[in-house]
Amino acid sequence: MPELCRFYNIVIKMIYSDNDQHHKPHFHVYYAEYEASVGVDGELIAGSLPVKQLKLVQAWAAIHEDELYAAWNNAVRNIPFGKIEPLR
């Protein structure tokens, strides 16, 4: 699962060919013992994150929405995608 971004101890990854599980563009978030799937639109789809970290992820996703959709479109076609700038 390639890493898209890392900031504030939050790791964001996207899986190739992963449109069957949730049927919407999403990415996977890892923070300490927490794991979650978050839609490109910022919706928490599965799992859990502390509120502060979820808000940081949602802010990052809003800033990079176009890049996330581009990465998703590549990922579902098994085409490599690049990293996205972290939240600063």
Language-model segments: which ranges?
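Glycine-rich, flexible loop/turn motifs
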Residues: 3, 40, 45, 77-83
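Aromatic side chains
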Residues: 7, 16, 27, 69-72
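A short, structured beta-strand/loop element
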Residues: 15-51
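C-terminal structural segments of small proteins and small subunits
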Residues: 58-88
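Short, charged/polar N-terminal "headpieces" of proteins
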Residues: 1-23
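A short mixed-secondary-structure module that forms the rim of ligand-binding clefts
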Residues: 55
